Regions:
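Charged C-terminal helix
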Residues: 209-249
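Phosphate-handling active-site elements
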Residues: 9, 75, 174-176, 201-215
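Conserved N-terminal subdomain of the carbohydrate kinase-like
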Residues: 1-87, 241-247
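Conserved phosphate/ATP/ADP-binding segment of small-molecule kinases
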Residues: 93-175
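Short pre-catalytic strand/loop immediately N-terminal to key active-site residues, enriched for Gly-Thr
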Residues: 175-188
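Short glycine-enriched, charge-decorated loop/helix-capping segments at active-site entrances
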Residues: 24-30, 90-95, 125-131, 183
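Glycine- and other small-residue-rich loops at beta-strand/loop junctions that grip anionic moieties
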Residues: 54-55, 90, 155, 187
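Short, small-residue alpha-helix embedded
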Residues: 121, 185-208
């Protein structure tokens, strides 16, 4: 829905089947890596693609297959949202999968979008001398960008602050910082909305920094207009803009 809001067409490849509701994920079945590859290559042989967006992969095998496919299309930008930590602080993927993402996917990534907890998991391996230390944003970003990744967007959604500060880094350092009023409530899918929106903006030809700006604005609006259809968290209203059209009430 986020991608459609930017007038792009999403071509989905299923990586995992989940049992979930508005509160969270209860169980996951990972798709076999051969199936993942067949899905992706069938689509890529049929239609032109302007941007890749990778979310949950679920297994080391799927990480490896995704990396192989991406390597065959070096001119297509890649937005990586690895989904290593949920909104309820649940951790997904063991350290071997985290290492596989770091070693195989990050070097091919145009932009990685992660919250502070995910950034720390990816940039601070558990075998370091101080595994419980919390790295600052700039150090997390530096370690992520050392792999060859071009941009790192670190979001402050999990920080205990009055505003949410998102920071975009390149190997030169921080290139933009955006602060957003922290909205009341708990949201399900805010990170997915942001990364999908960035991918859509890049697909439409925007430079990365402008894509990040527009995607943040869109995501904040979806959260401001969020609704709560069940007993769990609020769902971003990705089509909020239709309610702002003249004549709509």
């Amino acid at each position: 829905m986020s991608i459609a809001s930017f007038r792009c067409h999403a071509l989905s490849v299923v990586t995992a089947l989940t049992v979930q509701d508005s509160a969270g994920i209860e169980n996951t079945t990972v798709v076999d890596s051969d199936w993942l590859e067949d899905q992706a290559r069938t689509i890529l042989e049929d239609m032109p693609v302007r941007c890749f967006k990778i979310g949950t992969l679920g297994s080391i095998e799927n990480v490896a297959v995704a990396a192989e496919i991406i390597a065959d299309y070096p001119d297509i930008p890649l937005v990586l949202d690895p989904v290593l930590t949920s909104g309820h602080s649940d951790e997904f993927g063991d350290e071997e999968m985290v290492s596989a993402i770091y070693e195989l996917l990050l070097p091919q990534t145009t932009l990685i979008a992660v919250n502070s907890r995910e950034a720390h998991r990816l940039s601070a391996p558990p075998d370091e001398d101080e595994p419980d230390s919390i790295l600052p944003f700039d150090e997390c970003a530096r370690r992520l960008l050392e792999t060859g990744c071009e941009y790192a967007l670190l979001t402050g959604v999990h920080e205990s602050t009055a505003t949410t500060a998102n920071e975009l880094y390149t190997i030169r350092g921080r290139v933009r910082r955006d602060e957003w009023d922290r909205l009341p409530g708990s949201f399900y899918g805010s990170g997915d909305t942001l990364s999908a929106s960035i991918a859509a903006c890049i697909a439409r030809g925007l430079e990365v920094e402008e894509a990040v700006r527009q995607a943040q604005e869109y995501t904040w609006q979806t959260l401001a207009a969020a609704f709560r259809p069940g007993m769990g968290r609020c769902i971003p209203n990705r089509f909020f803009w239709t309610q702002l059209a003249p004549g709509n009430k």
